[in-house]
Amino acid sequence: MWTDRWGVTYNDNRTALIHIDNECFCCEEYTIPEGVRSIEDNFMLIDNKRLRKINLPSTLRYMVDNTFIECPLEELVLPEGLTEIPGCMCESCLELKRVVLPSTLRVIGNAAFCHCKILSNIVLPDGLEIIHADAFACCVSLK
């Protein structure tokens, strides 16, 4: 395992983000390195509500449920190659204004963007097959 200076731990070959130390993590912007294929912990920072921007690698293919729940992200750009958005991925991200979905996206999980109250615009890709229940519930600004 390898842990960076912000308390984010990756597996030995650095293809999976496996743990985020909530007491050490204090970034407003964080970049997950290229080569990481999965995020297996979430960024719900109980004591730290600073994360405004996350840069995801083009190699990302899997994210755990609740990945960014309650984070103060303002924008999220999901990489091409990602086929599924997990359940509750951005639930209650109250600062989230903009999301860019990849053309490869097939599934949006349950409550993925629920309560993102200022999310105002999202373009759904042509190949999208499934939008689970409440994916956009209470997104009162969505057009």
Predicted regions and their residues:
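Structural signature of tandem-repeat unit edges
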Residues: M1-R14, D21-S38, D47-Y62, C71-E84, ...
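Consensus positions within tandem repeat domains that build extended binding/scaffold surfaces
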Residues: N42-F43, V64-T67, P86-M89, G109-A112, ...
